[in-house]
Every structure is written in structure tokens, then in C-alpha cells.
Amino acid sequence: MSSSLLSVLKEKSRSLKIRNKPVKMTSQERMIVHRCRFVDFTPATITSLAFSHKSNINKLTPSDLRLAIGRSNGNIEIWNPRNNWFQEMVIEGGKDRSIEGLCWSNVNGESLRLFSIGGSTVVTEWDLATGLPLRNYDCNSGVIWSISINDSQDKLSVGCDNGTVVLIDISGGPGVLEHDTILMRQEARVLTLAWKKDDFVIGGCSDGRIRIWSAQKNDENMGRLLHTMKVDKAKKESTLVWSVIYLPRTDQIASGDSTGSIKFWDFQFATLNQSFKAHDADVLCLTTDTDNNYVFSAGVDRKIFQFSQNTNKSQKNNRWVNSSNRLLHGNDIRAICAYQSKGADFLVSGGVEKTLVINSLTSFSNGNYRKMPTVEPYSKNVLVNKEQRLVVSWSESTVKIWTMGTDSSTEQNYKLVCKLTLKDDQNISTCSLSPDGQVLVVGRPSTTKVFHLQPVGNKLKVTKLDNDLLLRTSTKLVKFIDNSKIVICSCEDDVFIVDLESEEDEKPQEVELLEVTSTKSSIKVPYINRINHLEVDQNIAVISRGCGVVDILDLKARISKPLARLNNFITAVHINTSRKSVVVITADNKIYEFNMNLNSEAENEDSESVLTQWSKNNTDNLPKEWKTLKENCVGIFSDIENSSRLWFWGATWISRIDFDVDFPINKRRKQKKRTHEGLTITDESNFMNDEEDDEDDDIDMEISENLNVLLNQGNKIKSTDVQRNEESSGHFFFTDKYKPLLFVDLISSNELAIIERNPLTFHSKQKAFIQPKLVF
């Protein structure tokens, strides 16, 4: 019988129909789809953005270029701009924490350093290898509102609410923050900071003034306030200078304030050159390009304005003009940043809308732009238990569990059976539920807790299980081997087995891991050699690392053996025990299937030698739907009835592939072309070690699908079936109907649970600025 899809339940934003009566159809397969929209996960507001490198249009994009995204729940996300952007790491926040400023330090020969501030007197340096704080430095000068780094990357300046600007020396290397000096104090909060080289600090303050301090070493004016410039006064309230940047080419300062004005100041004489009343509300952020030919501003009115400088050589005084603006956001824009190189041209913005918007910097007015999905589940916060038909979701410090019914006679056939709120400050990093649905493991960066779930009536009774070992163990990833044994990967990358029912549960069985060779990239980006995926099936486990290393673990013998070495970031891993293979997806959405043989020595074998025949035939021959994907694959699972049929899913799509069949090859080939629309890295630098990246030919594939829509009026269920045809034989399916997706998995052989979030529910309680309607 051929495969086809899907019998879709009638969509309701808050309700769920669970069961459809089986319909007998010749040469067709019926599958019930549960569109689960009851999971109330909402991502946090984007509060800050920072690129790890300075722009340089004369060089190729460095392999270690990263974007840090700070959110209002204290999380920091690290993104790689390659392969249409993908998330590499999440640093978990905590209760009542927020990231209000981010700053990178990039010094040759040293690893990247990341600093953050967030509503306290502390500057935090993060350990990028573990995701834990490396150093918390208290500046002892009030709550910090702003942070900036000098050109030499050896000093931080932080602005406080008591009017103090503190300079911190970071030249000692990772983890070393030392007090340098305190600049002359004034009364107003320092809302924003910028440097002119290493010699001057520029601050925007809450009294409507821009101040310039001297930071020159061995100068008699060191620490003194040199100049003060005042912006326009608001009628009813004091003006706030939210953002300032320095423009080296013209020796100017650009400022944005709460009146909606953008002003350009002469640095040398501290005088106003030009002023634009462009925005209808507060200007919250500014950025510029490499050559300072453009300045971009954004804020509460949701618009991004571009200011261009008139470079007419016949004019002595080059003037700034308001050249264009675009309305791309649905709410306040809190942060904006830019990066340029030979192969990169990014203008990135984000805010209350919670999603990232990527523009082309040089063709801003009429170029392409991309709005990322609001949810990108690289780090998943949902799981599905098949045996008990449970859906588990966790966010910040709360775990919620729903049960899904089997009777379609009720309008709302799901129920919240458990809500667990932890008292600890740290956000939950991962959870795992035993196959029988009775034991829940909750992991965080500092501790791990175990709970027993017992059905009592229509609820689940939660009982905490004591385990001193786990209480002092940090957990990054955790999976169940069976109903009592778990495999844990700690934040320090130790992998060990714990038997929860054993009397010796305080003695973990550590698995011996292979050493990973250090590379130029792993020295610069410490987490690149760390474990990012852990998959377990019976007594076999597979781990993958950010650098593309895949190892297979024998949990009985507690040893590991190499499986594959890929030159790309791995976004999803799956063990297929029936086929005795491991399926891996990389950031460029290539599917690799490796033979899984614990008895063979693979140290001297290359990745190609362990590829299955299917992978050799099809890895570079995937359908055009896969080749043009913008969102990465983040999940894989096998079909229950036929393990050769694998399901793949990303934030906005679902696909199924039959691994028993090869894709047809069209001999007609197109010329090489890029499909990234200029919004990702396009030069020849590579993900690892700056090696050249060979682009694959674009192969035409024609996978025909005949979709017949049947409407069952009696049950009010809309179903979609894919008819069998001789060419495709139903071996490939692809849909982008469901979005954005939090999680996808099978509940039974003919039931598919799609955990999606209605985009309308993402809107913040904070009302967006209302733009006047256009009247023609």
C-alpha cells in the first residue's frame, strides 16, 4: 500500500478534535492530525542585539561570526548567519532577570567573550563553553543601564542610574574584570554609551543631554566631563536620549531621543549640525554601516528610517538626508545592529514583536527582507508521551502537562492535568518523561530534580523524589533508557547513567567519551566542540557536537566510538534501530544516514565509508522543496508501522521520506545559483576553519502530488489525502500548512500530534504604536 497524507481535523484556535472514524479507501492511507494549540508558550521580547565582529568590507566573513540576542526573560541566544541563519546555543536566564545590553570582546588569539547587563549593578561575563556565568562583576555604582566597549577591546564602559560611568579593564583575559576608573559624575541616568576610539566616552542621559568624557591615559583631563550638548525639550516631560553612536569618518555623533528626533553633532566643537523630526515616538536604537554613509534609526513607532549622506564632491559640507523608511515590525523596535563584509550585508532588528527581521543594509529601501519565525525550536521545550498520550511543555520555571483524549464526541478533547512551578530562580533547560509516563526529570544549569507522576482522578499527583546526586548535577540534556534509567549530559559535557531505582543511585556510571581535536574555530567559539544533541534507543546512544562530530555510545559497555565527522553544524539526530542506522541533518538541510555498527573500528574511516546506500544516492539529490527551505530541520522521528519512512520537521514545514526508495534524478541541471536573497553569508568562507565551501548543483526534481480535499460534514472534519501515482508512488510528502511549530511526533501508528502556536496569540499585552491609515 502506498503512502499518502493527511486527514486534517477542522482547525480551531483553542479546541482539539481527537479521533476520526476510520475510512476505507483503496490504495490510500489515512492519518489523523491533532493540531494542538493549547500549549501556551510565548517567546520573550528581544531587548538587545550584538554582532561578535566589527564590519570589514575588504575581508571575507570570519568563520566565527555570531549574533547574540538578549531577551526579556534573561535568555541569550547565539545565532550563526550561515545557511539562512540557525541557532547554535541558548544561555538560560532566570526568574525576574532580563538582558538589557550585550557586548562582545574579540581579541586575536583569544576566544570570544560575551558580556551582559540586566537591571542590576552587575556585569556578567558568560562561559560560552558551558552557558554558565564565568564572572559576575559588581561595579558598586547603582543599577547599570548601558554598556559599550572601546576600539581596542580591552575596556568596558557602563552607565548607571546614579549618573556614574564606570570603566572596567578586561585586558587580563577571560574571567578577568578589574576596576579602572570612574568618570566625573553627573545627576542624570546614563541611558546609552559609545566610544570614540579609546580616548573618549559619549553618553546619552535622562535629562536630555549628551555628555563627552575624556578616557585618555596619562592625560590631565582623564575622567573629566569635557562637553555637554542639549537636545530639544518636550512639552510635558523630560527628554530622554535613548541612543548615541559615533561616526568616525565625519567625526560626528548621531543621537536619538524621546521626541522622535535624530540629531547629528560635530564632535570637535560639540555643536549641532542637523536635526530631523523623523519618528512619531521615541527613538530607541541607532546603527550605521562600515563607511558611515548610512545611519539607521528605529523605535516605538515601528518604523526603521535610513539617513544617507550627500557625498557630492562639489559641495564642501556633506549633508544628511532622510532617504527612506520601512514599516516591517508589528510593535516597538528595541534593538538594531548591522554587519558588513565581502559576503555579508545585514541589518538586523527586533523588539516587542519577539521576532528577528533581517534586511539588506545597502539595499534597505527596496531590497529583500526576511522575518524569522516567532518560534525556532532548536532548543525544544515540548515532548509527547505515546503510552499515556501526554503533552509536556516547559517554560522558564514552569512545567505543564496535558492529556489528549481519544473520543471526538467532545468539543475540547484535551485537559491540563498538571502544572508544576519550581521555586528555584534558574530557567528550566530540559525535561524528559519516562516511557510509562510516571517519572519526570527536570534539568537546569545548576541542578536536576526528579518527580513521580501518579494519576488521581482527572489530575496527576506530583511527588518529588530525593536524589542527592542529581540535586548537585547540572543538566544540559537528559533521556530515558527505560522506565528507571536515565542518561544525562551535564553542562561540563560529562555523560553518565543513573538508575533511579537502584540503591546505589548516588554512584553514576560515567560513559567514556572520545576527545575532540581543537581547531581554530573551537578555540574562538568554545561551545563549538560541545555536545548539542543526545539521542537514546535502548542501550545505544548517539551524541553530536556543534563542530559536526557524531559519536555512538554503547551504554552497556559505557564506551564511545566515532561514527562521522561532518564539516557543518548538526541540527537534528535520530536513531533508527530497525535499519541499524543514524540519521543526521546539517544546517544546510542535507540528510545523512550512517550505518550503525558498534563492532567495527571506525577511527580511520571517513564519513563517506559509513554512509548507507540510500545516503550515497540521495544526500545530494534531495527534492527541490528541501533545497529551497529557509528554515532548518530541527526534528526527526520514524514511522511506527514502517521504520523506513522518516518524518522531518522545521519551524514552518513537515516532510516525510521513504528511505526504501531513491529519488528520481533529472539529468537536466541548472546553473549554479544562490537562493538566499542576500540575507545570509554568500562568500566562500566556511562554517569551520575558513575553508572553501563548494556549493552543490541545484537539481530539478518533479514530485507530483494530487491533493483531494474531502469534507466530512457529519464530524466536521476536513481531511487531505495524497493519491498514489506511478511516478512518485507516495514516497515523498511535504507541507508548509502548519506554522509555527513547537514540536511534532506520532502518538500512534495513525495519529500525528502537531504542537503549533497560533501567531495571533504572540501579540504582546503592550499595545503597538498606531500608524495613520493611508487614504487614496
Swiss-Prot record:
WD repeats lie at residues 35-40, 132-169, 178-214, 230-266, 271-308, 417-452. The gene is UTP4. It is found in: Nucleus, Nucleolus. Interacts with snoRNA U3. Interacts with MPP10. Component of the ribosomal small subunit (SSU) processome composed of at least 40 protein subunits and snoRNA U3. In the absence of snoRNA3, forms a complex with other t-UTPs. This complex can associate with pre-18S ribosomal RNAs. Gene3D superfamilies: YVTN repeat-like/Quinoprotein amine dehydrogenase. This is U3 small nucleolar RNA-associated protein 4. The keyword Ligase does not apply. Involved in nucleolar processing of pre-18S ribosomal RNA. Required for optimal pre-ribosomal RNA transcription by RNA polymerase I together with a subset of U3 proteins required for transcription (t-UTPs). Keywords: Nucleus, Repeat, Ribonucleoprotein, Ribosome biogenesis, rRNA processing, Transcription, WD repeat. Present with 5440 molecules/cell in log phase SD medium. It holds the Pfam family WD40. GO terms for biological process: maturation of SSU-rRNA; maturation of SSU-rRNA from tricistronic rRNA transcript (SSU-rRNA, 5.8S rRNA, LSU-rRNA); positive regulation of transcription by RNA polymerase I. GO terms for cellular component: 90S preribosome; nucleolus; nucleoplasm; small-subunit processome; t-UTP complex.
